[in-house]
């Protein structure tokens, strides 16, 4: 038994001093024990920055979990075998992609900040109540965001609210239901949003890359939409609209959302900076010579000049043609919406990962309005997005299914390859007691090998198969962990 427990945050994953800009240069030094830490405001900030940095390291997983089981990307020759198996529907608990350690590492950092920050005020008289509440609010936000990803990926997961820092820690937690997790994080966000920063940092990277009040409202809107609480979605989106701080970029500069990023449309995005060796994963996932992920046939038909009139979001913006019938994802490798100017040097790995932007929350609101049968208001928002993209407005029948399909299509156009498509489809499949379950199944099996389509379609009539299994090593390690019954082969 350990007699002096090392500060677990430090010994888990922080093995390098990577930072994306000055505000993330504070990482806890290796080898500290708890009794030597949590003495100053800087100690709190450094652990919070470690949480942000570790979350940034999940960008590869956010792409994989948000895209590869859907219909907008396909694997190329160098797609990893584990990811190929998932995209083909051959999903088993021994697949390392099912390891949730990265998310729980972020959660543990956040738990440390939440638990210990108040005590630091006793040692550091310059650490004010206002500063403490602001930093802990950011920790609540990151923890809630991680849990929101976890329940959409795995459904029921352990709800760990205390840091792993003593011998009394429960290292064998049981799972909580997804609803229990959603209730917890919703309450945490509502209680702490008042303390969140509000654009008061001295640089754009912090204002867009740290959990602001608007980021709180965006996450709350997203959670409410997942729970089909449409009035709450509208309330949270309107709270953002009322700030008058965010706008849709003109179509002529739409690509600035990706280069250089941090635009007036941005609400919250993970910051990367190749100059500081804080490199994203999306460049290597999507560049042509890597041959890992390409646009699907559906994406090509949505964006290619051969099939569509998407002048703002289409060919040379979202995708780029490489010879006859060959395309790459352009958002993360291009420097302009011209299909010619590539990111180069350290800029190649500097594209941020956008978690929320204004177009996203507007379409959340449109979805909520349409489900409440407020069709004219919903249509106005859809056409606002389309007008910005220089495409013709829609006329839709006044029924929720027509609007659901139109919004799904608009979100696919606007947020292609941004890690949102799978979760959008999953939300559609769950709505109204799985009324459109077959639509989701048809989409899932579209890109799987023909020999597997019928078998997979039958298996996926069980909605538990829409979620990933718990990694087998987690089951072996934790005697209280129960596998998703869909994967009890």
Identify the function of each model-found stretch.
Residues 18-19:
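C-terminal motif of bacterial Sec signal peptides marking the signal peptidase cleavage site
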Residues 35, 61-81, 160-162, 197-283, ...:
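Short, surface-exposed recognition loops and adjoining beta-strand edges that mediate ligand/DNA contacts
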Residues 39-43, 48, 52, 76-102, ...:
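Elongated scaffold/linker segments in the mid-to-C-terminal portions of large proteins
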Residues 41, 45-49, 53-54, 79-154, ...:
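Conserved, well-structured interaction surfaces
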Residues 136, 143, 150, 213, ...:
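Structural register within alpha-helical repeat arrays
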């Amino acid at each position: 038994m350990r007699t002096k427990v090392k500060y677990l945050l430090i010994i888990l994953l922080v093995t390098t001093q990577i930072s994306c800009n000055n505000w993330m240069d504070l990482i806890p030094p290796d080898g500290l024990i708890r009794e030597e830490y949590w003495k100053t405001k800087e100690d709190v900030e450094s652990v919070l920055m470690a949480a942000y940095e570790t979350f940034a390291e999940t960008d590869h997983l956010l792409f994989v979990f948000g895209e590869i089981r859907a219909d907008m990307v396909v694997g190329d020759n160098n797609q990893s075998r584990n990811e190929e198996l998932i995209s083909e529907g051959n999903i088993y608990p021994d697949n390392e992609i099912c390891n949730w350690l990265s998310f729980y590492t972020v959660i543990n950092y956040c738990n440390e900040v939440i638990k210990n920050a108040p005590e630091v005020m006793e040692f550091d008289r310059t650490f004010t109540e206002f500063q403490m509440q602001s930093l802990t609010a950011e920790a609540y936000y990151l923890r809630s965001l991680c849990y929101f990803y976890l329940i959409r990926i795995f459904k029921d997961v352990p709800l760990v609210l205390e840091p792993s820092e003593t011998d009394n820690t429960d290292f064998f937690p049981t799972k909580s239901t997804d609803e229990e997790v959603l209730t917890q994080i919703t309450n945490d966000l509502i209680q702490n949003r008042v303390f969140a920063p509000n654009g008061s940092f001295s640089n754009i990277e912090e204002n867009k890359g740290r959990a602001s009040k608007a980021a709180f409202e965006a996450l709350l809107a997203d959670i409410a939409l997942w729970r089909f609480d449409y009035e709450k979605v509208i309330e949270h989106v309107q709270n953002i609209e009322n700030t008058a701080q965010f706008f849709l970029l003109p179509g002529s500069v739409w690509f600035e959302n990706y280069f250089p990023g941090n635009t007036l449309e941005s609400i919250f995005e993970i910051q990367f900076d190749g100059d500081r060796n804080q490199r994203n994963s999306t460049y290597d996932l999507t560049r042509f010579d890597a041959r890992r992920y390409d646009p699907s046939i559906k994406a090509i038909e949505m964006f290619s000049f051969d099939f569509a009139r998407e002048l703002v979001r289409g060919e040379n913006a979202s995708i780029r043609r490489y010879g006859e019938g060959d395309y790459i994802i352009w958002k993360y490798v291009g420097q302009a919406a011209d299909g010619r100017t590539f990111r180069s040097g350290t800029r190649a790995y500097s594209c941020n990962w956008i978690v929320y932007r204004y177009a996203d929350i507007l379409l959340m609101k449109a979805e909520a309005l349409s489900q409440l049968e407020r069709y004219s208001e919903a249509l106005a928002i859809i056409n606002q997005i389309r007008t910005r993209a220089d495409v013709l407005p829609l006329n839709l029948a006044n029924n929720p299914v027509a609007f659901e399909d139109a919004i799904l299509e608009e979100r696919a156009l606007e947020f292609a390859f941004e890690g949102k498509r799978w979760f959008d489809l999953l939300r559609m499949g769950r709505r109204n007691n799985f009324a459109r379950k077959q639509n989701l199944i048809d989409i899932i099996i579209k890109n799987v090998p023909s020999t597997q389509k019928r078998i997979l379609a039958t298996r996926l009539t069980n909605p538990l198969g829409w979620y990933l299994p718990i990694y087998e090593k987690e089951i072996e390690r934790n005697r209280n962990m129960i596998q998703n019954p869909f994967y009890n082969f």
